[in-house]
Amino acid sequence: AKILLETLRNLPEQPVNFTIEESSYSIEISSDNGRYKLSGENATDFPRVPSVSDGYSVNIPSEVLGTAISNTIYATSNDELRPSMTGVFLKLDETNTTFVATDSHRLIRYRRVDITSDMAHSMIIPRKALTLLKATLPTEATSVTMEFNTSNAFFDFNKVKMICRLIDERYPD
């Protein structure tokens, strides 16, 4: 999907024809500038999409979530030897929501008292997932439903659904 989007983005404004070959799971894109053939895979070869069984949910305004990501993501670590620090720690409780990021040189905490949860929960969301989420958040104000369990986080807004695997580590105290 990423290669398809990049190919279409780089084409000039002109008519484009798509030819889908279902037997080989390939797509051919034809335009005045040339022909591009992309191969695909059978959907049954991919793992099943996880479901949010035994999970919890919280609604976060898109502008609040975007601000929280912008204020914390730059301080995450690139050190893969310390995976807990390569994401943003999110802590929800009855009184507030806190986003924390550190690379061991900088420590950023962003707290909101207007977003709460009935029970205390905490998780580490990977930097890459938050970067993607920030890029897809709508510019107009909308509510983002975040559902989560012990291993995954599910973000749902407008017609966008995003699932990410949480980092299964203990965040430094």
How does the language model describe each region?
Residues 1-173:
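Structural preference for solvent-exposed beta-strand-turn elements
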